[in-house]
Regions:
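Hydrophobic transmembrane alpha-helices
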Residues: 1-60, 70
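Short helix-perturbing small/polar motifs within transmembrane alpha-helices
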Residues: 1-4, 19, 26, 82-130
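Membrane-helix interfacial "entry" motifs
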Residues: 5, 9, 13, 34, ...
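Hydrophobic alpha-helical transmembrane segments
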Residues: 14-19, 43, 47, 58-63, ...
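Alpha-helical membrane-inserting segments
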Residues: 23, 27, 31, 48, ...
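Interfacial aromatic-anchored transmembrane helix boundaries in multi-pass membrane proteins
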Residues: 28-40, 65-99
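Pore-lining transmembrane helices
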Residues: 41-43, 56-57, 64-65, 158, ...
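Membrane-embedded alpha-helical hairpins and interfacial helices in multi-pass inner-membrane proteins
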Residues: 112-187
Length: 187
């Protein structure tokens, strides 16, 4: 591959990563405020990794987190800053990166097939729930008082299971269609 082709591919990678970091931000702004805000962030993360693949998708999620950490209002409710990441629901936001990295690992181990992507999205969601709920319990205990696991799951996980399953199905459909339209070399 020529030097100009390599430079072009790197430039395209950077553009796609930036665009999909913005997609995640836009999805986070579509929000219904609850104890843990209902947003389309998980949808955005899953579409990002589904279209760009694990490596590029993980970079896009990292860029999204980095922008939010330095104060750019990319999180739910047009918020940003370390206070959000360290707050009660920050673990779910950090869990997005863990989800993307896990999806990348599953992709590396099992290849890029639709059923593998679906499986990795489910595993990614479980990891996000686990990190976010553990973080929520610790942050809530420091800020308000102790909270039991059953209560935390009732507030932070159970109400989101069905909507998140719907988001996974939609993310699979969108990822497959967008990947075909973009004709990306995802390997």
């Amino acid at each position: 591959m020529s030097t100009s082709a390599v430079a072009r591919n790197k430039t395209l990678d950077m553009v796609y990563i930036a665009l999909f970091a913005v997609l995640i931000a836009v999805c986070s702004w579509i929000s219904i405020p609850t104890t843990v805000p209902f947003t389309l962030q998980t949808f955005g993360v899953f579409v990002t990794v589904g279209v760009l693949g694990g490596k590029r998708g993980s970079f896009a999620v990292f860029i999204y987190l980095l922008l939010g950490a330095i104060g750019v209002p990319v999180f739910a409710g047009f918020t940003g800053g370390m206070g959000i990441l360290l707050g009660n629901t920050g673990g779910y936001i950090i869990g997005f990166l863990a989800s993307a990295l896990l999806m990348w690992l599953v992709e590396k181990l099992l290849g890029r097939k639709t059923w593998v992507l679906a499986l990795s999205m489910v595993f990614g969601l479980i990891v996000c729930y686990a990190i976010g709920t553990a973080w929520f319990m610790i942050a809530y205990a420091q800020n308000t008082g102790s909270i039991g696991l059953a209560t935390a799951l009732g507030w932070c996980v159970i109400p989101f299971i069905i909507p998140d399953i719907v988001k996974i199905v939609l993310a699979l459909v969108v990822s497959n269609r967008v990947s075909k339209l973009m004709k990306l070399n995802l390997n």
